[in-house]
């Protein structure tokens, strides 16, 4: 996964008034925290933040910090991002400082591959889990988890425990949880009902 860079500034003051003033000039208030450091209040340019989380990796992109005194050069991921519901503008961001040698927990989107056999036969494909919780080293964070549905027939499902993930990547969700399924009646059931 490609590492992005973002410029930050430490901020001395916190609170609603300060945060509003920052947002008015195109900056997003935030905090950097992680193992071995005290939380540090920061601000980041809204456009830089948007550019850092765009693309397949999204919020799981590795981000290198520039500026911010002692935070310069540290690698972070976006732990929490709040947006205004109507405007979609950033309200605040939390960065989690990571160590490249320690596993992290991330939320990764599911990408369906192929056309389900059951869907071709008139069934309805239902994506139950749009994302999965994974644990892996930062360098192993996938942009998405591919789930091949090509052979998925009506009345069948794919569960978390059936996924084949890369070495070192572990799914944290319940292994019995359904990711995707195909619902509907098979041709045999339809024929019996008509007869």
From Swiss-Prot:
This is Large ribosomal subunit protein bL25. Belongs to the bacterial ribosomal protein bL25 family. CTC subfamily. Keywords: Ribonucleoprotein, Ribosomal protein, RNA-binding, rRNA-binding. CDD domains: Ribosomal_L25_TL5_CTC. The gene is rplY. This is one of the proteins that binds to the 5S RNA in the ribosome where it forms part of the central protuberance. Part of the 50S ribosomal subunit; part of the 5S rRNA/L5/L18/L25 subcomplex. Contacts the 5S rRNA. Binds to the 5S rRNA independently of L5 and L18. One of its GO terms (cellular component) is cytosolic large ribosomal subunit. The keyword RNA-binding applies. GO terms for molecular function: 5S rRNA binding; structural constituent of ribosome. The lineage of its organism: Bacteria, Pseudomonadati, Thermodesulfobacteriota, Desulfuromonadia, Geobacterales. It holds the Pfam family Ribosomal_TL5_C. The keyword Repressor does not apply. GO terms for biological process: translation. InterPro entries: Rbsml_bL25/Gln-tRNA_synth_N (IPR020056), Ribosomal_bL25/Gln-tRNA_synth (IPR011035), Ribosomal_bL25_b-dom (IPR020057), Ribosomal_bL25_C (IPR037121), Ribosomal_bL25_long (IPR001021), Ribosomal_L25_dom (IPR029751), Ribosomal_uL5_bac-type (IPR020930). It comes from the Bacteria.
């Amino acid at each position: 996964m490609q590492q992005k860079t973002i410029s930050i500034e430490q901020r001395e003051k916190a609170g609603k008034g300060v945060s509003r003033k920052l947002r008015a000039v195109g900056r997003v208030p935030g905090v950097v925290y992680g193992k071995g450091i005290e939380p540090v209040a920061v601000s980041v340019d809204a456009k830089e933040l948007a550019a850092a989380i765009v693309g397949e990796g999204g919020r799981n992109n590795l981000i290198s910090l520039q500026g911010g005194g002692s935070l310069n050069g540290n690698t972070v991921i976006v732990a929490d991002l709040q947006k205004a519901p109507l405007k979609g503008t950033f309200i605040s961001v939390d960065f989690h400082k990571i160590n490249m040698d320690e596993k992290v927990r991330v939320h990764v989107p599911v990408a369906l591959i192929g056309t389900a056999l059951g869907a071709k036969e008139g069934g309805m494909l239902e994506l139950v889990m749009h994302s999965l919780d994974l644990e892996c080293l930062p360098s192993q964070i996938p942009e998405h988890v591919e789930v091949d549905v090509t052979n998925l027939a009506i009345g069948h499902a794919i569960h978390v425990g059936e996924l084949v993930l890369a070495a070192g990547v572990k799914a944290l969700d319940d292994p019995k949880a359904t990711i995707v399924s195909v619902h509907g009646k098979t041709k045999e059931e339809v024929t019996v009902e008509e007869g």
